[in-house]
Amino acid sequence: MKFSRFKSRNTNYYTNTIITTETQLNNSNNNNFNNTTTINHFNKIHQQQSNNNNNNNNNNNNNNNNNNFINFSNHTNNINNNIDNRSDKKRKLNCMEKSNISSSSPYTLTSTPSSSSSSSSCESSLLNLNNEKLIEDKIISFSNENVGNIKIISMSDSKFTIYNSNNTDYKELLFWKVWRNFFLKNEILFHQRLYNLYSSFEFNDLKSLLNFQYREYLQHITFSFYFDEPLSLINFKNNNNYNNNNIFPNSVKKITFGYSFNQAINQNSFSPNSSSLTSLEFGESFNQDIQINSLPPSLTCLKFGKNFNCPLSLGVLPLSGNLKSISFGLSYNQPIQYIPNGVEKLKIGGNSVYNNKNNNVNNKNNNKINKYPNSIKIFKFDKYFNDEIMVGTIPNSVLKVKFGVQFNREISMEQIPCSVTEIDFGLKWNQPLNEFSLPKNGNLKSIIFSHFFNQQINANCLPDGLTHLKFGPLYSKEINLNHLPSSIEILMFHNSFQSLNLLKNYNNLNNKKIQIIYYN
């Protein structure tokens, strides 16, 4: 926190900066009263100030007894004290004895209780502080005295700022208090270096994880390609430092299994008390049943590999409401019926969608349909998906649809829910568009055509309400801007499109402003 000095225009000395803190104390009768503490910051005091202090201001003393807090400014042109020099010196000496602070300081601290306090207390107390560091120390010490607010007042412009123990300025003051301590700063930097080195680490086996010297710094654990051990400490029962529920440190937020991992997941696999694990990613080979209540309730992201195809019964996926993202791989063809409410992002493989056609006589699950919660907002298809999209495949709550790399099928407005606001077509998608391809309700705002798209954009094939339109690097068709919806605001093309000069009627848009962006 900085203590500013303000130069007065009419005098050759500096005006005051006042810092006031409001705190609640108990008097001898156990009644609450306000104690106001003011710090007056003097840089240079004019030689005549001591003479002016003896002039007038009797009325100010009477008003001060009725205020909950008093700001002492000592600005010599505006505020004069009517206190006898001898009594003033006596108060200073009494209070300096209490504070053990030298009287030679240019900084003063004055404390005045309200009129409800006991008569034995001083009307005012003056403490001298040696420098700005002592002022910071005093303000920090207020946190132990039930301080409510800290008020900084500039007498030059009558502006003031109020700080409290919860705001960023107060916390910044505490931060610098620690950071300026040489020992504490070195300790912080030392642990920061260890965190940077070991917060993310790869292990080949559980033994190396259990014996890892810097376990407490781990946040992301990755197991190597060949790792395939049961997640149990049975083989380490002679190790007294760990119990069966502490394979992973409580600091870990993400676990990524390698390609070969294919072990059962049970209630002993993860610590039931773990509240930090938020992301779990299985490898391509994983295809094991998961017991109910085995996955940590703190999970927010869950990703299965390409070969996973085990049914998920009710209770397998955490019902805590924290789970926000689930991703299934290519092989998954089980009915999706128990996705917890609260999941916002869902990625499914091609086989899961194919089973919903209900026309595969060899599929035992063809009489079951997927059930999605209304919380799903982002719907993604696996990169290998390239089947026809059946009506109802995409949930009606979805806002964004993203197709996979291989998808290259015609689409119709019946396949895309009216709730969708953004569509991202896959890398290979290159199908013609007509007036029945996309929803016309006006909710669709953004379309991204990817790498291979190169179809003519005709009139009325894009819906009204569309604002953002992006074309891939291979697009080389002429675009008549009059054929685009009047709502278009941003057009994005690859740099190669700019040299083709294929934008028509750009100057005949009737004062309509379209931002054209070229990217690399």
Swiss-Prot record:
FNIP repeats lie at residues 242-285, 286-331, 332-406, 453-496. Keywords: Repeat. Residues 47-86, 100-121 are annotated as: Disordered. Residues 51-84 have a biased composition (Low complexity). InterPro entries: FNIP, STK_FNIP-Repeat. PANTHER family: FNIP REPEAT-CONTAINING PROTEIN (PTHR32134), FNIP REPEAT-CONTAINING PROTEIN-RELATED (PTHR32134:SF183). This is FNIP repeat-containing protein DDB_G0274063/DDB_G0272642. It comes from Dictyostelium discoideum (Social amoeba).
